[in-house]
C-alpha cells in the first residue's frame, strides 16, 4: 500500500502514465491503439484485508505502507467499496467491548458486492469454541439490521460458517444481468465495475465468432458464462475445486446450456489434446467434436507454460487477459510469430498502483 498515491485528484494523470508505459513496452509488436478502461477513483475495491492492532482497550484496522515502512491505522479505506467502509465502522464498534470476539483476533477480510451482500471473515491466533460461535451469531443478528451479512471464523485448521461462505454478485453487462457465486478465500476480480468493462470488451471482440470457444483458467466461469452467447459451445477448464463448484452453480443460475466445465489444469488439458495422456475426468466428453476456432486464456501472474503456449498457438484467434504485462510480453514473443495483435486494452483494476490488467486479441497472420 502507498497512501500518498491514493489521491483521486491525480487519478487521471496516473492512468495516463500507465497507458504510456504500456504502449512503450509493447511497441515492438505493432499493436493498435490502446483502449483504456478507467476505474472509479474511489470505493472501487469489492474486497479488502486488514490486520488488527490491539492497544489496551482500543482496537483498530491497519495496513502496512511500503513507502513509510510502517503500519498505518485505517478507520476508513478509500479504495474499498462504500459498503466495506460502512461495515468497517459498524464491526469495530461491536468488537471493541466483546472479549470473546476480539481475543487474539489478528485479521479481518471483507468481500462485498454491487448487489449489496457482504461477507466478513474473522481470523484468530486461537481455536474457536462454542462461546465464540454464540457471540458471533449474536453479532450477525445485530449487524443484519443494517447489512446483508454473513460471518466466518477462521483459526489454524478451523473454519466456522455461521450460514454460508459466499456472496452472489450481480453484474449488468450490456443488456444482460449475470449472477456469480463468489466464494470466500477464492479469486474474484476485485474491481467489479472494471470487471464489467472487461466482460463487455471480451464480448465485443468475439462478436460474430464461428464455431466453439475453449477457455483455460476459467475460475468461477466469470468470462465463459458471459461469452457463451457468442459461440455454439464453450469448453472451459479450471483446477481449483471451489472455483469449479462455483462455476457449476453460476452456469445453472444464469441458465447457460452450452458451457461445459472440466476440472483439470491447463497443462493436463494440453496433454489430453495432444493425446499424450488419458483422464477419467474426460470420460463422456468428446474433445474431437469441438470446433474451437477461438481460445480464451486468463493465466496466473506466471503467464502460460511452454506446452500450453504451443497449444494456444494452434488456434485461429487468441483472447488473452493478463494480470502481468511482463509475462504477457514474454508470451507474445512466441505468439507474435504466427498471430497479430488486432485489439489491445488496458483495464485499470488497481488504481494508484503499478499493476496493469491488459487484454489482447490475436488473429492468425
Curated annotation (Swiss-Prot):
Q: Which reaction does it catalyse?
A: uridine(54) in tRNA + S-adenosyl-L-methionine = 5-methyluridine(54) in tRNA + S-adenosyl-L-homocysteine + H(+); uridine(341) in tmRNA + S-adenosyl-L-methionine = 5-methyluridine(341) in tmRNA + S-adenosyl-L-homocysteine + H(+)
Question: Which organism is this protein's natural source?
Answer: Shewanella sp. (strain MR-4)
Record-stated family: Belongs to the class I-like SAM-binding methyltransferase superfamily. RNA M5U methyltransferase family. TrmA subfamily.
Identify the catalytic residues: 323, 357
The reply on keyword Ligase is no
Q: Which Gene3D superfamilies match?
A: 2.40.50.1070, Vaccinia Virus protein VP39 (3.40.50.150)
Q: Please identify the protein, giving its name as recorded.
A: tRNA/tmRNA (uracil-C(5))-methyltransferase
Physiological role: Dual-specificity methyltransferase that catalyzes the formation of 5-methyluridine at position 54 (m5U54) in all tRNAs, and that of position 341 (m5U341) in tmRNA (transfer-mRNA).
What is the uppermost EC class here?
transferase
Q: One of this protein's GO BP terms?
A: tRNA methylation
The family database entries (InterPro entries) matched by this protein are listed as:
MeTrfase_TrmA_AS, MeTrfase_TrmA_CS, SAM-dependent_MTases_sf, TrmA_MeTrfase, U5_MeTrfase_fam
Query: Which key words tag this protein in UniProt?
Result: Methyltransferase, S-adenosyl-L-methionine, Transferase, tRNA processing
Q: Which Gene Ontology terms cover its molecular function?
A: rRNA binding; tRNA (uracil(54)-C5)-methyltransferase activity, S-adenosyl methionine-dependent; tRNA binding
Q: Which residues are recorded as binding S-adenosyl-L-methionine? A: 189, 217, 222, 238, 298
Q: What is the lineage of its organism?
A: Bacteria, Pseudomonadati, Pseudomonadota, Gammaproteobacteria, Alteromonadales
Cellular component (GO) terms are:
cytosol
The gene that this protein is the product of is trmA
E.C. number, please?
Answer: 2.1.1.-, 2.1.1.35
Q: Pfam families, alphabetically?
A: tRNA_U5-meth_tr
Amino acid at each position: 500500500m502507498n497512501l500518498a498515491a491514493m489521491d483521486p485528484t491525480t487519478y487521471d494523470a496516473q492512468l495516463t502514465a500507465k497507458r504510456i508505459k504500456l504502449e512503450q513496452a509493447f511497441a515492438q509488436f505493432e499493436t493498435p491503439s490502446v483502449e483504456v478502461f478507467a476505474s472509479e477513483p474511489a470505493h472501487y475495491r469489492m474486497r479488502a484485508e486488514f490486520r488488527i492492532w490491539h492497544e489496551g482497550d482500543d482496537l483498530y484496522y491497519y495496513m502496512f505502507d511500503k513507502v513509510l515502512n510502517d503500519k498505518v491505522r485505517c478507520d476508513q479505506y478509500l479504495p474499498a467499496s462504500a459498503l466495506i467502509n460502512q461495515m468497517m465502522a459498524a464491526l469495530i464498534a461491536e468488537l471493541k467491548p466483546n472479549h470473546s470476539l476480539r481475543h487474539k483476533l489478528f485479521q479481518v477480510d471483507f468481500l462485498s458486492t454491487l448487489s449489496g451482500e457482504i461477507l466478513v471473515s474473522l481470523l484468530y491466533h486461537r481455536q474457536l469454541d462454542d462461546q465464540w460461535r454464540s457471540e458471533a451469531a449474536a453479532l450477525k443478528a445485530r449487524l443484519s439490521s443494517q447489512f446483508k451479512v454473513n460471518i466466518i471464523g477462521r483459526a489454524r485448521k478451523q473454519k466456522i460458517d455461521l450460514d454460508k461462505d459466499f456472496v452472489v454478485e450481480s453484474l449488468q453487462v450490456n443488456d444482460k444481468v449475470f449472477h456469480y457465486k463468489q466464494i470466500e478465500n477464492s479469486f474474484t476480480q476485485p474491481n467489479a465495475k472494471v470487471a464489467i468493462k472487461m466482460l463487455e470488451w471480451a464480448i465485443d471482440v468475439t462478436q460474430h465468432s464461428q464455431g466453439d470457444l475453449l477457455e483455460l483458467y476459467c475460475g468461477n466461469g466469470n468470462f465463459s458464462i458471459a461469452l457463451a452467447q457468442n459461440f455454439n459451445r464453450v469448453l472451459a477448464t479450471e483446477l481449483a475445486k471451489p472455483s469449479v463448484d462455483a462455476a457449476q452453480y453460476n452456469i445453472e443460475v444464469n441458465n447457460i446450456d452450452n458451457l461445459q466445465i472440466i476440472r483439470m489444469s491447463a497443462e493436463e488439458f494440453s496433454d489430453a489434446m495432444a493425446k499424450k495422456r488419458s483422464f477419467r475426468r474426460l470420460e463422456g466428453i468428446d474433445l474431437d467434436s469441438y470446433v474451437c476456432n477461438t481460445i480464451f486464456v486468463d493465466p496466473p501472474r506466471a503467464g502460460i507454460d511452454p506446452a500450453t503456449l504451443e497449444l494456444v498457438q494452434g488456434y485461429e484467434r487468441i483472447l488473452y487477459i493478463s494480470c502481468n504485462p511482463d509475462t504477457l510480453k514474454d508470451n507474445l514473443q512466441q505468439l507474435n510469430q504466427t498471430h497479430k495483435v488486432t485489439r489491445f486494452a488496458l483495464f485499470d483494476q488497481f488504481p494508484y498502483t503499478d499493476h496493469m490488467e491488459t487484454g489482447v486479441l490475436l488473429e492468425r497472420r
